[in-house]
Amino acid sequence: MAAALLPLSAIAQVQPTPAPVTTLPTVTVQEQAIDPNPNAEVGAPYKAKTSADTRHTRPLAETPQTIQVVTGEAIRDSGATDLKQILAAQPGITLGTGENGNAFGDRYIIRGQEARSDVFVDGLRDPGMTTRESFAIEQVEVTKGPNSSFAGRGSAGGAVNAVTKQATLDYDFTRVSAGVGTDSHHRVTLDMNKGFTDKFALRANALTSGEDVPGRSPSQRRRDGLALSGLWELNQDLSVTLDYYGLRAKDKHPDLGGYLVGTVPNRRPATGVPVYAQNSDFLNSDVDTVTARIAYRFAPDLKLTSLTRYGQSDNRYATTGASNGTVLDAANNPIGTAGVLDGGHTGWQDVKYFAHQSNLRWDKQIGSLKHEFIFGFEYTDHKVKSGNYGVTNTGATNCRVSGRNGPQAGWCITDLNGNPVSNLGDLAGRSYERRSWTRDWRVKTFALSAMDTVDLTDQWTVFGGLRADHYDLSLDTRNNQTGAITGNYGFNDTLLNGHLGVSYKINPMGMVYASYGTAQDINGGEPDTGTSSGYGGLVIHNGSAAGAKPETSQNIELGTKWNLLDDKLLATAAVFQTTKDDVMEGANYDTEGTFNTGKNRVRGIELGLAGNLTKNFQLQAGAAIMKSKVLRSAVASNVGNPLSNFADRSFTVQGKYQLTRDFSFGAVARYESSRCGGQPDTGAGYTNGMCSQPVPSFSVYDLFASYRINKHADLRLNVLNVTDKDYYTAVYRSGAFLYKGDGRAVRLTLNLDL
């Protein structure tokens, strides 16, 4: 037995020493929500990596141009819903007022230049002056500086591109959000994507919402929308997408806000102005568009992308304004002041448009250089027919006031002590009847473009392009009561624009660049103003609308961009100068004006930061410091003045901190300096060296917080305008109405991932 055990004992004694145990590092798996946005930076929800416009062939951090992107995550956290609210919070952008179908500030001013017709959806111009909602938006891109080689005519200060949610084969998800809040707020949205086979997917977005305007009840907003996107990938080289977008926006008792009182140097917003909208007032937009996209790869280095869209919108409004008036006694002696209703502002606009755009990308090695060519073709046909409403008043007047043509009876909304009168919503007994058209506007455009991006060395890159637009414009005007044609105008021309940029890569994280770009616009290029020369309408000189040169803008920009913190944070800075020459000038509703007599300049610096400061802290911030000056004008008193509706300082910051796995909180702060109202592209009005129609500066603060209940549900709380600040976003040229920002509002939203 002992002998038998000896070999085992020997084996035991010679067994090797066990290897030391290796302890592997702990791997932390951070759960992230699915982000179907193909342009997003993974792990940095406030940062976009690329532009949705495929003509930008490089990431945003390598593009020698200021392009500000607001991601869908940032939009949802902020609580903003209408596109107007999103853009108003961005640096370098202000809102304007307008009429003729553009009543409420869906008019944007970028770096001091008119941009109400420079709004694009997925790269195609959206010609309707409509209310625009965010329920189907993936991200919003704002390109700063003249941009006609991409956007075509216009775009003197830049352009806005709303990128819509598209079907994808990569994920299946269903998200439902339901919110309630103060001011009778309710909002329900659906975002669902489903792949039915490995080749076909459908995405649906739906919206129903409504609320009283915070602080301005009984003014109300209602939005209902549906967006459908179907993707069919026939094979790895060919895909087809078909989209439908529909929105019904209805505002009851739309509010024109306050008005200015006093005279310079004591010109200021009136206090305690009640909501004086009449019960019959309305602002409605109905939008329907269908878009087809085809992407085909002929070869690994040759790809065609085509978009075709047909759209129509029906925009209608009838609003009532008010201003400060002098109240008279029976003997026509002044006895005080009060707010007085005006005669109303009405308009309707029927828009029909067709657009096709094709871009061919060709990556080609020529010698030692690899080129990224983009060859483009575009055809658009935009038709806008517009008119107004007849106004009937049956309400008894309640005061005697000093009018334009002397003493007259009127409707005072307050008594001499500033107290609102009774039955204010039906004071004028106002009703509206749609009249036939007064303006029939049409522009057909055929465009060709060529662009190239090429690396000269590992550090030097050149980016450039040219675009030619041949347009044919026609405008008929008529008297809608007699039916008589009052004007028939038409002309055509070709515009040539370009851009050129060069960048130097300092290291893998950062680069510096210089860029130059141009833009041109045409006489009568705004579809909503007819021959109202002071509002961007067709300018007639010596009885003719033909013969004017295009307005021309040039931009020089020097900047730097840095991709920091493992590419999760993008920091940008740029200095720029935009000069606009050959500006058409006119006054108010006058048809007669002067061709190419104006010139203005904007200089500034713009800073941006977007992404993750730490793994728990997300940030999007921007600041613009600018100075504008009228260099030449047919009106000598305008020379040297800043541009109208121009804020020389603005900034916004939105931050979110993830305190625990389930709880996050954040805030939004924005500031806009004071500005002077007036007409587009003109010097602000001054009296004795002081602004005649001032809009005060303001700061507004919002708070938000989110709590994840489980992996399928979370709650988000938004408190908008926390301090209930009275602030104003735009003023009419005469100070007769002053658009007011929303008061404090609280929203609670339940988000479900099903």
Predicted regions and their residues:
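C-terminal beta-signal and adjacent terminal beta-strands/loops
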Residues: 674-680, 706-754
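Gram-negative outer-membrane beta-barrel transporters
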Residues: 574-579, 595-682, 723, 751-753
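Structural signature of Gram-negative outer-membrane beta-barrels, strongest in the C-terminal barrel
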Residues: 231-235, 351, 370-372, 376-382, ...
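Outer-membrane beta-barrel translocator/receptor signature
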Residues: 135-138, 149-226, 234-238, 288, ...
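Acidic/polar loop-and-plug regions of large Gram-negative outer-membrane beta-barrel proteins
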Residues: 209-214, 222, 226-297, 310-351, ...
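Membrane-embedded beta-barrel scaffold of Gram-negative outer-membrane proteins
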Residues: 295-299, 303-309, 313-319, 513, ...
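Surface-exposed extracellular loop regions of Gram-negative outer-membrane beta-barrel proteins
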Residues: 248-263, 383-385, 472, 503-557, ...
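Acidic, small-polar-rich N-terminal luminal/periplasmic segments of exported/outer-membrane proteins
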Residues: 25-171, 558
